[in-house]
Amino acid sequence: MASNIFTQTNIAVIWDFDKTLIPGYMQEPLFRHYNVEGRTFWREVKALPEHLRREGHEMVAVDSIYLNHILAYVRSGLFKGLSNRLLRELGGELEFYPGLPEFFPAVKDHVAKNPLFGKYDIKVEHYIVSTGLRQMILGSKIAEHTDGIWACEFVECRLPPGYLKEGKPQS
């Protein structure tokens, strides 16, 4: 007879980020850095889906359309010099709800020290899944307490058509 009735012993806790771990939106430090009024940005984002539908774009993902608007700000020069390094730095300005990030390691520690959980080799893992900017989350004080972060990446350089010659990147 099997000594362990559990075939999976890791408990994965999946967290959203904005308004779950922090009281507002992670983009606020970005707006402050570039002196952009956040309310104006979000009002524009809210109006984008209807505007794009009128242009024939029916399948606009409402949760991530703000990313296209960030790119519009980059192209227009309003977010001049935006980089992953800067996003990570700005992530350090994010303020978390009281008790965070301390709650993450406290839960892991509680489970690890509890003999009942130890008997079955039960462990807790914390993951963040967000439509936010991954580099900002990685720069925040909660990142070191997570087991994985899935979020949107800002691709700084786009490779031109034909960048692969014979299956290898060309320098």
Name these PLM-found stretches.
Residues M1-G162:
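Alpha-helical substrate-recognition element adjacent to the catalytic core
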Residues P161-S171:
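Short, surface-exposed amphipathic charged segments that create phosphate/polyanion-binding patches used
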